[in-house]
Amino acid sequence: MTEQQSLEAIRYDHDHGQLKILNQLLLPSEYVYENVEGIEDGWQAIRQMKVRGAPAIAIVGMLSLAVELRSKSFTEMNEFDKFIRDSLEHLKTARPTAVNIFLACDLITKLIDNLIILGDEAVGVAKIEVIRHIEEMLHKDVESNKRIGSYGAEAILAKVPSKEKINVLTHCNTGSLATAGYGTALGVIRSLYGRDSIDRVFCTETRPYNQGSRLTAFELVHDGIPATLITDSMASLVMKKKDISAVVVGADRVLGNGDTANKIGTYQLAITAKYHKIPFYIAAPTTTIVLDDSKDIVIEERSHKEVTEIQGIPIAPSGINVYNPAFDVTPAELITGIITEVGVFSPSEMKSKLQTILNS
């Protein structure tokens, strides 16, 4: 299989401790892997959106720490502890809205809390244990996504039992390029396609970064899934005219009450789906869900150049003011169901059911 056929956003070599990421800024015209040799490389790759998607951001951030750990030696546990905590705090600043990296950092912090009591003589063992936990995150993400795909396909088809094949609409990129593999919302679509239940997928271009046209369309063509690319402003008409059975999107952060932060444009799709009585689903692993819904969601704002330029070519007059939030928040009342690796839940029941499942 050639590099162009494999569609891996992240390549990690356990034996040699090497990490490569597919530079998604160059897709679909160029297919280039770049080395990530430590934490700063990981931070830059995330910040510059060479890698994106909440699950992939977390995995690349953590693996960049694992790569740097392999090249370092420590003699004192306090020195090791400080390095880990400082590194985690730095990685969290790369993209503030995507929650997965915050939760991954919390898991490593809790691990360190347990390891530090072992004393200086165990610092080598502690380093190995942190690397092992990080590598497990990579493998768990793929399996989690496949379960999301299966649960999501079942939920969507349950609402359209009389149809042999269905049309679905998706937004941004939530596939192999946004995760460790398979995808969340696009994983649901892959599962539907594997059941011979897809007639056509409509994907939005997703301005201003065009993750839909550059990345999702790329994945759909690669997989041979029948697909049609539309501009963001066409979504309402497509819902009216093209017999859409479901809208399924990913998430960068889901609160316990079901409110969901996702790529800008998700909110308006949810409103339009509600008007047309089309089920609207969020597909996200439990690592994207924050059961404490009292915390505010920080919405990242990005450079005006993402709106006023395309590949350095101006498309707007100099001096125009630009508002460029990367995400919006969809209220829970617009969401039909939240698809996770442990089941599909309505927003109102999600918190209590997840607490029961995750604490059992």
Swiss-Prot record:
Biological processes per GO annotation: L-methionine salvage from methylthioadenosine
Gene Ontology CC, one term: cytoplasm
Predominant place of localization: cytoplasm
Catalytic activity: 5-(methylsulfanyl)-alpha-D-ribose 1-phosphate = 5-(methylsulfanyl)-D-ribulose 1-phosphate
An annotated Gene Ontology molecular function: S-methyl-5-thioribose-1-phosphate isomerase activity
SUPFAM superfamilies assigned to the protein according to its UniProt record, in alphabetical order: NagB/RpiA/CoA transferase-like
Keywords: Amino-acid biosynthesis, Cytoplasm, Isomerase, Methionine biosynthesis, Nucleus
Keyword Cytoplasm (UniProt): yes
Residues marked Transition state stabilizer (site): C172
Residue numbers annotated as active site: D252
Known pathway: Amino-acid biosynthesis; L-methionine biosynthesis via salvage pathway; L-methionine from S-methyl-5-thio-alpha-D-ribose 1-phosphate: step 1/6
Keyword match Disulfide bond: no
NCBIfam families documented for this protein: eIF-2B_rel (TIGR00524), PRK05720.1 (NF004326), salvage_mtnA (TIGR00512)
Protein family (similarity comment): Belongs to the eIF-2B alpha/beta/delta subunits family. MtnA subfamily.
Protein name stated in the entry: Methylthioribose-1-phosphate isomerase
Species of the source: Trichoplax adhaerens (Trichoplax reptans)
